[in-house]
Regions:
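N-terminal beta1-alpha1-beta2 module of alpha/beta enzyme domains
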Residues: 1-71, 75-78
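Flexible, glycine-rich active-site loops centered on histidine and acidic residues
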Residues: 2-23, 85-155
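Residue-level detector of alpha-helix boundaries and kinks
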Residues: 49-52, 83, 125
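Catalytic metal-binding/acid-base residues of hydrolase active sites
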Residues: 51, 81, 113-115
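Active-site nucleophile and cofactor-binding loops and adjacent substrate-binding regions
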Residues: 78-86
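Active-site glycine-rich loop that binds ribose-phosphate moieties when present
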Residues: 157-162
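Conserved small/polar residues in nucleotide/adenosyl-binding loops
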Residues: 164-166
Length: 167
């Protein structure tokens, strides 16, 4: 059994005090919670990806990179990486960099995302979100495992012998 602590980083008033932290203070609180989770023996800390209010978790690789710099053991989870919304090449670059900086502590969870606000923001339809996710995952996985990738798909420009190599 593994024990994880996961957050979507809501940015709302505290239910007890009624106080809403500044964005910077809320991010500091998330990092402090991850540090405490490591001290308490949790196996992993996850940051979800959301692109709408009341969440401020639109950049999990950035948040997880800061957590990686402040911790040494805890596994770093995405909860989830929404490849239906993201360019898989850019996602690969961000997460491969994070995995290297963290000493290999990254654990990726891939999902299609949810919510109409996110789909609207990235011009993804309910009809294409699953196909986008599958195609994005296929390219992402190839970039992670192969040194040279040539790619042609439906939802992003072709890659002609991509030599991206971070992993």
């Amino acid at each position: 059994v593994k024990f994880l602590l996961i957050t979507l980083i809501t940015h709302t008033e505290d239910p007890v005090t009624g106080v809403r932290l500044s964005t910077a203070d809320r991010f500091r609180e998330v990092v402090a919670t991850a540090e405490l989770a490591e001290e308490l023996g949790f196996d992993g800390y996850g940051v979800g990806e959301r692109h709408e209010r009341p969440f401020i978790s639109s950049a999990p690789p950035v948040v997880l990179s800061h957590i990686a710099a402040r911790t040494s053991r805890i596994r770093l989870f995405t909860a989830v990486t929404t490849l239906s919304l993201l360019d898989p090449v850019r996602a690969f670059e961000d997460y491969a960099t994070l995995d290297n900086l963290s000493g290999g502590r990254l654990e990726l969870i891939i999902g299609k995302g949810n919510g109409s606000a996110q789909r609207d923001l990235f011009e993804v339809t309910t009809e294409t979100q699953w196909a986008r996710n599958a195609e994005g995952y296929e390219l992402f996985r190839r970039l992670w495992r192969e040194d040279r990738v040539t790619w042609s798909g439906r939802f992003r420009p072709a890659l002609v012998l991509s030599l991206i190599h971070i992993s």
